[in-house]
């Protein structure tokens, strides 16, 4: 089973001193002294990279810890999903809901994670991701090690870790073929 994002963050934090020469507490003091808004995690990561050459995973861990210290609370999966399907994209939510139901029904080893722009579904590794791509389209990203033949699959490098994607414009598009392709991705990533 894949490590949770919190487990991975803890592992990165545990190795910060070895990887960067500073502990998390030392990095948080530097971020605080820099004058950068700790709630702007992108700005903190840019500063860590440009000024200190901090590796990417360490940037994420430090920026996350700085934001949490400033009062930020990570949204729940449902809050991330709600934010993705608001405004002009609110009409796409039923497509997401149909996909999420089909994907999570594959097994109790499927976990759903929250992201700002897409929703990943993970088994041993991410095998599916759902993203509101346009006002009238949801992209279903699937990760294959051996892609099946299907005219609906488009080679892709997103959303998430997808090797292929399918454009969906209605709940009716979440049909038997799409569910079969999701099952193949699930089976190949367990």
Map each language-model feature to its residues.
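Charge-dense, helix-prone N-terminal extensions
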Residues: 1-190
């Amino acid at each position: 089973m894949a490590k949770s994002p919190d487990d991975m963050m803890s592992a990165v934090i545990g190795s910060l001193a070895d990887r960067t020469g500073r502990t998390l507490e030392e990095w948080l003091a530097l971020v605080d002294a820099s004058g950068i808004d700790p709630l702007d995690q992108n700005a903190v990561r840019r500063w860590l990279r440009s000024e200190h050459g901090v590796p990417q995973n360490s940037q994420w861990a430090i920026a996350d810890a700085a934001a949490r210290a400033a009062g930020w609370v990570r949204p729940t999966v449902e809050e991330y999903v709600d934010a993705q399907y608001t405004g002009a994209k609110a009409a796409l939510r039923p497509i997401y809901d149909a996909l999420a139901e089909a994907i999570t029904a594959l097994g109790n080893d499927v976990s759903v994670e929250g992201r700002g722009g897409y929703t990943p579904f993970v088994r041993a590794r991410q095998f599916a991701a759902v993203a509101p791509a346009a006002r009238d389209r949801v992209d279903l990203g699937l990760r294959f090690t051996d892609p099946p033949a299907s005219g609906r699959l488009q080679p892709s490098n997103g959303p998430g870790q997808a090797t292929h994607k399918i454009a969906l414009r209605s709940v009716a598009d979440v049909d038997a073929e799409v569910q079969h392709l999701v099952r193949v991705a699930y089976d190949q990533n367990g």
